[in-house]
C-alpha cells in the first residue's frame, strides 16, 4: 500500500518526505499481521527515505483496511501533471508492461519461471528516482495502474489530444511458452505495473537515452500525441 502511494509521487516528479498511516484490523488477525506489516514498512521507509509521522490503529469486525496519506515536495515547485502534453509530443514508458498481470494469472503456479512476475505483482517498484530525473523533461505523466490503454487515455483526455500507440514498440516481458498475444493483452489491459507513462518534446529524446543508461531503466518510445481525431487512443500495427 505504501509503494502504490509512492508511485503517485513518482508520477508527479516529486520526492516523498513523510506519511500518515491508519489501520483497521480484527483483533484476532493483529498479532500475526502487524509485526510482518511493520517490518515491510520499515524496510521501505529506509529504502525510499520516507518517515512515518502519525496515524491511527483501530479494531474492525472482519476486514483489514489500510489508509495512507503521503506528503512530498517537488523540485523548484515544478510538479508534473496529466494535462501538459502538446500535439507532436512523444509518448514514453519505463520498464516492461504486463509482468504484474502475468504474475497474478499464474500466482498459484509452482513453476519458478513466474517468480519475477509474482514479485512484480506483490511488490511493485515505484519509480521515484526516475520521476525526479525526468521532472523537467516530462510535460505530462501518469503511473500505469490500470493498463497502458486506460492510463494513456487519461493523458489524452486531459490534454484533449489523440495518442497513436505503436503496438510493435510496447515493451513486453519474455516468457517461454506464453504467446505474444497473451503478453500484449496483459500489457495493454492488465494494470498494476506502476511504470511511468509520460510525454515529452522530441528534442528531449537524447536526454532520455542518457537517463535510461544512468538509471539502468529501459525507457521506450511507444507513440506520439496528435490533434484529437475521432478517438483518444489509436492503435498502430494492431
List the model feature ranges, each with a label:
Residues 1, 130, 148:
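Catalytic-loop motifs flanking and including active-site residues across diverse enzymes
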Residues 27-53, 59-66, 71, 136-137, ...:
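Glycine-/charge-enriched secondary-structure boundary and capping motifs
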Residues 65, 80-132:
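Short, acidic (Asp/Glu-rich) active-site segment that either coordinates a divalent metal cofactor
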Amino acid at each position: 500500500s505504501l509503494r502504490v502511494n509512492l508511485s503517485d509521487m513518482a508520477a508527479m516528479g516529486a520526492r516523498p518526505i513523510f506519511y500518515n498511516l491508519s489501520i483497521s484490523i480484527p483483533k484476532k488477525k493483529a498479532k500475526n499481521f502487524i509485526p510482518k506489516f511493520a517490518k515491510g514498512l520499515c524496510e521501505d521507509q529506509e529504502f525510499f527515505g520516507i518517515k512515518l509521522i502519525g496515524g491511527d490503529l483501530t479494531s474492525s469486525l472482519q476486514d483489514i483496511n489500510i489508509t495512507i496519506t503521503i506528503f512530498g515536495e517537488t523540485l523548484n515547485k515544478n510538479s508534473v501533471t496529466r494535462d501538459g502534453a502538446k500535439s507532436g509530443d512523444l509518448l514514453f514508458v519505463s520498464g516492461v508492461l504486463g509482468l504484474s498481470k502475468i504474475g497474478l494469472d499464474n500466482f498459484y503456479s509452482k513453476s519458478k519461471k513466474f517468480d519475477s512476475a509474482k514479485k512484480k505483482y506483490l511488490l511493485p517498484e515505484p519509480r521515484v528516482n526516475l520521476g525526479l530525473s525526468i521532472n523537467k523533461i516530462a510535460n505530462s505523466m501518469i503511473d500505469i495502474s490500470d493498463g497502458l490503454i486506460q492510463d494513456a487515455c487519461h493523458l489524452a483526455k486531459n490534454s484533449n489530444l489523440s495518442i497513436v500507440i505503436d503496438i510493435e514498440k510496447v515493451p513486453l516481458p519474455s516468457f517461454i511458452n506464453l504467446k505474444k498475444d497473451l503478453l500484449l493483452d496483459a500489457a495493454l489491459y492488465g494494470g498494476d505495473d506502476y511504470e511511468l507513462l509520460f510525454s515529452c518534446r522530441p528534442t528531449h529524446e537524447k536526454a532520455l537515452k542518457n537517463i535510461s543508461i544512468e538509471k539502468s531503466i529501459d525507457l521506450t518510445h511507444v507513440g506520439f500525441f496528435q490533434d484529437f481525431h475521432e478517438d483518444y487512443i489509436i492503435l498502430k500495427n494492431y
